[in-house]
Regions:
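A conserved structural/catalytic subdomain of Rossmann-like adenosyl-cofactor enzymes
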Residues: 75-323
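Conserved S-adenosyl-L-methionine
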Residues: 1-83, 88-92, 97-99, 144-147, ...
Length: 323
């Protein structure tokens, strides 16, 4: 059973079903957009997933989740959950309704910004919903702003503590800028595994990969080639350590780093040493001293010039007078 709480047109669900096998996969989805839900149903038809048509629901997942347990009291839980939540959508009208469900949103609900209401960090609610919707052995993935993975306070930090302390987080891949069609925000993909069998978390910094191109609207985007995709996938699956690209760290190591899931914070700092003779050292030091002396002298000259100009200023009572 595969589920997407912010399904859109079903791109992630279709990719997931192809990996699992359409004949072995049942799709469940919900999306606030009626248009997107219609497109998703068309995708289900085209991809041989007709039996899942009735499971594609239009509605507000956070306020009124449709897919429930048999008794209707709890969220239904799934084997796989994927989500690409909205980053720019106004949820101010439903914020209080969401906040009235603390059992579901255990880390809290973000406040609505006074000016840009659409910039509310609603993705934090979807992270909590994804985790709640996973079976005890379930696996999940969600697209998030990269800033989340180094959060030091607020709801974001509470979630980081939860997923690390409970050993729910399996890995994190920081993607290049502008790699997703619907946002220019720097994003990462956060992976969950509720079985808690892994002893290490794989962190990948893929932000430097990809090549720039312009889309149909003339906007700059970045795309990954097949080799780069294979590098990310292969490294992730093998939990391979690659210099300046990936690390595999224990949960305790993550705690020591303040619960950061940024690969770059775990890379070894390299210091290159160059052998030089005593004569070369003395020459370099002499050059440094001469350069600094010249810069100090110029700074002193400028200070004197500024003081000279200030002393030359005089009060003029006629300035601003209408006479």
């Amino acid at each position: 059973e595969c589920y997407a709480p912010s399904a859109g047109t079903g791109t992630l669900l279709m990719a997931l079903s192809h990996q699992i096998g359409e004949e072995r996969c049942t799709i469940f989805s919900q999306d606030i957009s009626q248009r997107s839900n219609k497109m998703l149903k068309l995708n289900l038809l085209l991809n041989g997933l007709v039996s899942s048509l009735d499971n594609a629901i239009q509605g507000d997942t956070l306020v009124s989740p449709y897919h429930k347990s048999d008794d209707g009291q709890q969220l239904r839980q799934f084997d796989f959950v994927v989500s690409n939540p909205p980053f720019k959508m106004d949820f101010s009208d439903t914020r209080e309704k969401i906040a009235a469900m603390p059992a579901r949103f255990w880390a809290g609900v973000p406040n609505v910004p006074a000016k840009k209401k659409e910039s509310m960090a609603i993705y934090t609610c979807f992270i909590q919903h994804v985790i709640n919707s996973l079976k005890k052995t379930g696996k999940g993935a969600i697209v998030i702003p990269t800033g989340f993975i180094t959060a030091k306070s607020g709801i974001e930090n509470k979630i980081l503590h939860k997923i690390v302390d409970d050993k729910v987080v399996f890995g994190c891949v920081s993607m290049p800028s502008n790699v997703f069609a619907n946002t220019g925000t720097n994003v990462s993909v956060l992976f969950f595994d509720k079985s808690a069998t892994a002893d290490k978390v794989i962190l990948i910094d893929a932000s430097k990969l990809g090549e720039e191109y312009k889309d149909a609207n003339g906007l700059k985007k970045v795309r990954l080639n097949d080799d780069e995709i294979e590098k990310i996938v292969g490294t992730f699956q093998r939990k391979e350590v690659v210099e300046d690209f990936s690390v595999a760290v224990t949960y305790d190591e993550i705690k020591e780093k303040g619960y950061s899931l940024s690969a770059g914070q775990y890379f070894d700092i390299k210091i290159d040493y160059v052998d030089i003779t005593e004569e070369e050292f003395n020459n370099r030091m002499a050059n440094y001293k001469q350069t600094l002396s010249e810069q100090f002298a110029e700074s002193h000259r400028l200070e004197e010039e500024i003081l000279k100009q200030l002393n030359a200023l005089q009060f003029n009572s006629n300035i601003g007078s209408n006479e």
